[in-house]
């Protein structure tokens, strides 16, 4: 008879301990340390008994206000970046290669060109090459097909940067 009473009591106690640990962990009260009280709400005399408060509600309010501030800051940053990018559209379009160039690899360069995705337009066109393009340019320069001639041991690619 005693076993029938102790087993449900033990299971209930174990489940309540697990729920309590989960509650404390979700509120940041790990290792017996409670999270710090928010000084802005408690120092102005709005709440007199800090032990009776539901601190999770206070932290939700505090997180919400900081999230709103963060959203406003990110929106301002995004607007400034967009105005910087769209303000220099003339310079940005001047750096693009001409579509009617007679280069044999121009279609490959246009397909791998990252100018459409760049946030900050740069006047240096060679920064947006992929690693395969750079490898091909270096191997072509070493083979002697570069503008420096076949006899030169120095590739012309490194002088551009």
Swiss-Prot record:
* InterPro entries membership: Procorazonin
Asparagine amide carried by residues: 31
Secretion signal, residue range per the UniProt entry = 1-20
Q: Name one GO cellular component term.
A: extracellular region
Sequence positions bearing Pyrrolidone carboxylic acid? 21
Tell me a GO biological process for this protein: neuropeptide signaling pathway
Q: Which UniProt keywords apply?
A: Amidation, Cleavage on pair of basic residues, Neuropeptide, Pyrrolidone carboxylic acid, Secreted, Signal
Coiled coil start-end? none
UniProt name for this protein: Pro-corazonin
> Per the UniProt entry, what species is this protein from, by scientific name?
Drosophila pseudoobscura pseudoobscura
Q: Tell me the organism's taxonomic lineage.
A: Eukaryota, Metazoa, Ecdysozoa, Arthropoda, Hexapoda
The gene name reads Crz
């Amino acid at each position: 008879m005693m076993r029938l009473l102790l087993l449900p009591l033990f299971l209930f106690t174990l489940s309540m301990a697990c729920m309590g640990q989960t509650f404390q962990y979700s509120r940041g009260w790990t290792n017996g340390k409670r999270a710090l009280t928010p000084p802005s709400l408690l120092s102005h005399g709005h709440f007199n008994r800090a032990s009776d408060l539901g601190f999770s509600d206070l932290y939700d309010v505090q997180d919400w206000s900081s999230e709103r501030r963060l959203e406003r800051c990110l929106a301002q940053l995004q607007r400034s970046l967009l105005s910087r990018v769209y303000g220099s559209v003339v310079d940005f379009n001047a750096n693009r290669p001409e579509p009617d160039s007679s280069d044999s690899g121009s279609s490959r360069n246009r397909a791998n060109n990252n100018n459409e995705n760049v946030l900050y337009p740069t006047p240096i066109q060679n920064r947006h090459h992929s690693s395969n393009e750079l490898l091909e340019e270096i191997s072509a320069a070493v083979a002697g097909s570069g503008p420096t001639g076949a006899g030169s041991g120095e590739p012309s690619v490194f002088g551009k940067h």
